[in-house]
Amino acid sequence: MTAVETNYREGLTQRLVNIYRDVDTAIIGAIADRVLARLDGASTPGIGAASLWDESSCLLISYADSITDGRKSPLACLGEFVETHLDDVIDSVHILPFFPSTGDDGFSVMDYRAVDPRLGSWGDLTNMSSSRKIMADVILNHGSRSSVWFRQFVDGEAPGSGYFLSVGDDFDVSHVIRPREHALLQPVTTVSGEKKVWCTFSEDQVDFDFSNPLLLEEFISIILDFIDHGVRILRLDAVGFLWKETGTSCLNLRQTHAIIQLIRYIADIYDDETVIVTETNLPNQENLSYFGNGNEAHWIYNFSLPPLILYSLLFADSSILRRWSMSMPPALMGTSYLNFLSSHDGFGMRPTEGLLDETQRQRLLDRLEANGSLFSRRAKADGTTSVYEANTTLFSALEKSDGDPTGALISARFVAAYALMFGLEGIPAIYFNSLISAQNHTDGVTRSGMKRRINRQKFEKDWLDDKLSDPMSRESIVLETLKKLLTI
């Protein structure tokens, strides 16, 4: 073993022990050796994170099938759209989950090592990665009930038998912070009897058990496979919920941060142009903690920004936004904020905690409801529920304001929102549906019963081409205006 390999092994072992303090050292050592073997030939980190982005960086957020034409794969259509319309302004593309999935529009994954053939292939992703940095979701927290792993869990077969979290009646869940309303623990009949599995986000999405170090080793292998396929930005989805301990909030626990530190360490070794992004839809100070000491996320989402900009523009009151922006610490060298105004999810309300008081928050929710928003709720420890997110497109959210009750200036308000965002420190990210000023897709909600579908409309390429070729269409005007702003 060379001196470099010895150093890597020590680093892996130390970080694994920090997570699994009660696991036999022989097991930890064996995992470190297997991971080290996978890293064989990796070069010493050298490029430096600060060189991976600059003031011109901009991220597009899109589903793999946001655009279809019935001829090419949706992924190929997306790549063609970016090359044709966004070549000079977008350098990175976040392609939302493209794996075989049973729900949540891709976030209930059956197989992390496959691309859903209805969307395209790994080759499509590799082709796109030749000219753009690709962000992919590492959905660490949970997997589909229909996955091979979960069938193994039910049947008592390895490795899946040890991959999912089930708890007994002695596990105290009274302090758990929830993002949803359904029952947290769901009964499942297995070969060894009935078990209660942990389901943070839906009954179809069963949480993994990261107290099993072999599961973490599995995900390390998956992450390295992603990098091999050209993925350079790893989005750790819902990572704050990863580790569970009885009697705690089961959110932002020490082991969760330690796992992120291990992933960062391995990614830096394997490919030093890899960027780690944590998706933690939390109050501001909790979100900031995911920078760690420069050893966790390269980027964190600026989750407080969307609701604060909405409040400013809807009520002609920038005081809260101004105070918040002045209080935000500058990102340290090698890290950055990821600024966004909309995404495939709704507008989170938890990031407004400590920024908007209850009266201000309710005022915002009332206006959003008047503008057509739906709301998703979460269960609280005291048995009540509260709004977790507002489900709406950004364009519809800004439809009518105090100063413009008829909505005549909606497009101007929409562009102003992005002008504000582009002027802030951080990397801007634009959701595909916002890029073309999409309005609330209520038909999608009606057909699916899913409130989030209001902002997840998909588009035919021919329809989109017609709109964007018409210089007088709203879609064309907004797109060209946003592109112009990005070049300033």
Residue ranges and their predicted role:
Residues T2-I488:
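Active-site and adjacent substrate-binding regions of carbohydrate-active enzymes
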